Amino acid sequence: MSPVTATEVRREKARARELRASGWWKRRLSRERCGYCAHPTPARELTMDHRVPLVRGGRSVRSNLVPACRACNAAKKYLLPVEWAAYLDRLADEADRIP
């Protein structure tokens, strides 16, 4: 996979801004749940996250966008879905080891 250029990232961010104003995105937010942890979160506090980050080749298309609480979005950063799942598994394993 070739590196993603700054121009490509800017173009995808512009597409994300357009989608953020769409009825489709507003309906997604109206569920008031994080797409990762499913924690109830007011719509105004949900962020738009790219499942496959832009810098890793992701696009601003509906199938790659998910409402995320700020905590999940900040923790996920530039992880791919498989890396994010492994991270969550590690957290669960660590929590199981706590007496």
Predicted regions mapped to residue ranges:
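Short, charged surface segments at domain edges that flank catalytic/cofactor-binding sites
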Residues: 1-36
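Polybasic, low-complexity binding patches
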Residues: 2-6, 19, 55-64, 74-99
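Short linear sequence elements within intrinsically disordered, low-complexity coil regions
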Residues: 30, 41, 89-92
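The −1 position to Zn-ligating cysteines in a subset of zinc-ribbon hairpins
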Residues: 33, 47, 68
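Cys/His-coordinated zinc-binding microdomains
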Residues: 38, 70-73
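Histidine-centered nuclease catalytic patch
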Residues: 38-65
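Alpha-helical architecture
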Residues: 47-48, 71, 78
